Swiss-Prot record:
Organism: Streptomyces violaceoruber
Name listed for the protein in its UniProt record: Xylose isomerase
GO cellular component assignments: cytoplasm
Biological process annotations from GO: D-xylose metabolic process
Subunit structure, as described in the record: Homotetramer.
Catalytic activity: alpha-D-xylose = alpha-D-xylulofuranose
Subcellular location(s) per record: Cytoplasm
Active-site residues (renumbered): 5, 8
Similarity annotation: Belongs to the xylose isomerase family.
Domain of life: Bacteria
Co-factor remark: Binds 2 magnesium ions per subunit.
Keywords: Carbohydrate metabolism, Cytoplasm, Isomerase, Magnesium, Metal-binding, Xylose metabolism
MF term (GO), any: metal ion binding
Length: 12
């Protein structure tokens, strides 16, 4: 959910 991960599981 941060950059391209809509799951917010990865801080990338």
């Amino acid at each position: 959910g941060v950059t391209f991960h809509d799951d917010d599981l990865i801080p990338f």
